[in-house]
Amino acid sequence: MASAKKSVDIKNIRNFSIIAHIDHGKSTLADRFIQMCGGLQDREMQAQVLDSMELERERGITIKAASVTLYYTHPNGQEYQLNFIDTPGHVDFSYEVSRSLAACEGALLVVDAAQGVEAQSVANCYTAIEQGLEVLPILNKIDLPQAEPERVIHEIEEIIGIEATDAPTCSAKTGLGVEGVLERLVDVIPAPEGDRDAPLQALIIDSWFDNYLGVVSLVRIKQGRIRKGDKMLVKSTGQVHPVTSVGVFNPKHSETDILEAGEVGFVIAGIKDIFGAPVGDTITLSSTPEVKTLPGFKKVKPQVYAGLFPIDSSDFEPFREALQKLQINDSALFFEPESSDALGFGFRCGFLGMLHMEIVQERLEREYDLDLISSAPTVVYEALTKKGDTIYIDSPSKMPDASTVEDLREPIAECHILVPQEYLGNVMTLCIERRGVQKDMKFLGNQVSVTFEIPMAEVVMDFFDKLKSCSRGFASLDYNFVRFESSSLVKVDVLINGEKVDALAMICHRQDARHRGIALVEKMKDLIPRQMFDVAIQAAIGAQVIARSTVKAMRKNVLAKCYGGDVSRKKKLLAKQKEGKKRMKQVGSVEIPQEAFLAVLKVER
C-alpha cells in the first residue's frame, strides 16, 4: 500500500552520508537522527538500526550502504527532507563509501573526541572532497571524561585541512547536542540540483536480490520523476521493465506514489535477471532513451584471491547461484570456476582483503546454508616469461615453471599509518619486519603520520590485526595498490608421501620460504591422523626439499608372544612386519582432514 509521502520542495532536501572510522559512533548517531525525526517508535528502536545484516550487528561494523529518509522541522519553521546514506568505515569496504558519496551533496565527518583523527576517516574524507562534497566535521563522544575537543579540532585542521573551529559537538549515546548537529547540517550542506520536469535520469547506488520481488535498486534521482507503472529503461542493458513499486526507507520499507529529482529511494521493476540492473548504471524512461548516461563507479580490483569449495560436491550449483546473488549486492566480489585434485570443484574468488573474504564466506554459509572450505589466500603476482609475455598469477597452481620465467613481480601497497608518538617504534619495527620501505613521516601534534611501501601479500594477510595489537588499537591504516615490483618469489609445494597436494601450495618470498615451510610441516604433522604406515610430509621448492616431518605408523607389538626366546626369531618377526608396512605404503592413500587445509591459513609469520 502506498503511503502519502510529503511532497518537499527540492531546495528543502539534504542528501548526506556520515564518514567515520570504526567505533567512532557513526551508527549510534544515525540511530539518534532516526529517533529524533520520528522514523521509528521508541519500542521499535534497537541499536544499529541500519545495520540490518545479522553479521553487521554481531561484529558491530557496517558492511553495506543503507539509506533512510527522515523529515526534520528546523527552528526557522521549515520542514526538510533528510536522505541519509550510511557508509562502512573499515578499510576493506572503502569502495562502498565512494558509491554512497556519489549520491550526496554533503558528508558529516564524525570524529571521536577522545581518540582523534584516524587514517580511514582521512582517506574517506579526501574521497568526499574529490567528489565535490561539502564536509561538516562533528565531534562525538563529548560526554567521555577523556574527551579533548581542542586537541581533536587542531588535528582535524592539521591532518585533513578543513576548517573545524566551530565544529558542532555532541554525544550520540546520550543524545546531547544532536539537535544542534541537525541544525548545522541543514544550514551547511547544499540542496541538490535538478529539474523535476526534465526527462528522468537516475543513478543506481546499490542493488540487492529479493526472492519475491526480484532486483531491488536503491537510486538517486538526478532529473525528472518516476512513478509506479512507468516503463523504465536500464541504459547499459537496453531492457525496458514496468515499474511495480517505488518508495523510500524510513527506515522501514514504505511505498510511495512518486520519487522526484533530488530524492533517494528504491525502485522495484520485477527484474528477475540477477545482472538486470547493475550498480552504477543509469535509469531513464523508455520514452526518453536519448538521456545521457551518468558517470558510474570505477571497477574495484580484487587484491586477495582464494579458492572456495563446497564440502558436499552436490552443492556446486547452489553455490554458483549464491555467489551470483551476492555479486549483484557486492560489486567487488569476483569469481571463476576452479577444480582441485584435493578439494574437487569450486570457485576461485577475488576479495578486497581478509575481512571481506571472511564476511563473504560467512554470508554464504549463513544466508545460503552452504558448508565451504577455503584454500590459502594469495595476492596477484605478475610474471614476465622468456618469450616476453606478461601473465598474472592469482593461484599457486598457475605459477609457471621457474625455467620459463624471466622476472617475477609482486604487488606493492602504499600504506598510510596514523599512530600516537609513543607507539611509533613498535609500528616501525612491524613495517620493517614485513619488508616495508619508509617513504615519509610527519609529526602532527600528538600523532605521527608515516607512509611505508609494503608488499601487498604482507598487508592483506594479518597486518591490520598486528598493527592494532602493537599499538593497543590506536594506530589506523589506509592502503592502496601502487605498482608491481621485481622480487625473489618461490612456490612452496607440500608433498604427502611424495605426492603434491595442490590445495596446500603457497607462493612466498624466498627469505620466508624455509621458515614458513617448517612451520607448516610441523602443523600438518599434528593434524594428519596416524596411519598403518609412516607418512612423510615435505615442503619443497621445485625439487629441493626444505622441510620434512614424519607421522609415525601405528604398529602391533609382534614380539608380545615371544617372551624370552632367541633374538634371531624376534628379528625375523620385525623384518616380516616391516615388509608388510612397506607393501601397505605403496598402495595406501592418506585421507587429509579439513583442518589441515586451514593450517596453511594459520601459519604464523
Curated annotation (Swiss-Prot):
Chief localisation class: membrane
Ligand binding (GTP): D23, H24, G25, K26, S27, T28, N140, K141, I142, D143
Cell inner membrane in keyword set: yes
GO MF terms held by the record: GTP binding; GTPase activity; guanosine tetraphosphate binding; ribosome binding; translation elongation factor activity
Cellular component annotations (GO), alphabetically ordered: plasma membrane
Domain tr-type G: 11-193
Protein localization: Cell inner membrane
PROSITE patterns listed in its UniProt record: G_TR_1, G_TR_2
Function: Required for accurate and efficient protein synthesis under certain stress conditions. May act as a fidelity factor of the translation reaction, by catalyzing a one-codon backward translocation of tRNAs on improperly translocated ribosomes. Back-translocation proceeds from a post-translocation (POST) complex to a pre-translocation (PRE) complex, thus giving elongation factor G a second chance to translocate the tRNAs correctly. Binds to ribosomes in a GTP-dependent manner.
Name of protein: Elongation factor 4
Organism of this sequence: Acinetobacter baylyi (strain ATCC 33305 / BD413 / ADP1)
